[in-house]
From Swiss-Prot:
The keyword Magnesium appears for this protein: no
GO terms of biological process kind: defense response to fungus; killing of cells of another organism
GO cellular component, one term: extracellular region
Protein name: Putative defensin-like protein 298
Signal peptide: 1-29
Membrane spanning stretches: none
Domain of life: Eukaryota
Compartmental location: Secreted
Protein family according to the UniProt entry: Belongs to the DEFL family.
Bridged cysteine pairs (disulfide): C35-C53, C41-C58, C46-C60, C74-C93, C80-C98, C86-C100
Keyword Disulfide bond: yes
Protein keywords: Antimicrobial, Disulfide bond, Fungicide, Plant defense, Secreted, Signal
Amino acid sequence: MSASKATMLILFALFLSDILLVSIPRAEAQLIVPCKTSEQCKSIRCSNGSAQCVNKQCQCPSLKQIYSVTDVSCKTVSDCVASHQCPTGLSACIEGKCICLP
């Protein structure tokens, strides 16, 4: 009886560790504030500089893109590494496109 409990505990631990690996976020959260002029963005506090009105949304200059999508199609990460579009070891294949990670 205790062997089956130990087995169930091990299986549950493996299941839990798998869930934690899958739930890695892909993007940073952003506050979207509509605007027509940069004057309307003065109330937004940015960590580096002041917010500007870009494409009718207030944006901080310190926000950076998490990754850049390339035009290279892929099936695996090896396809991305072979394309030499990203620094070594900083590429991934997501939804059939190579992306460069920061």
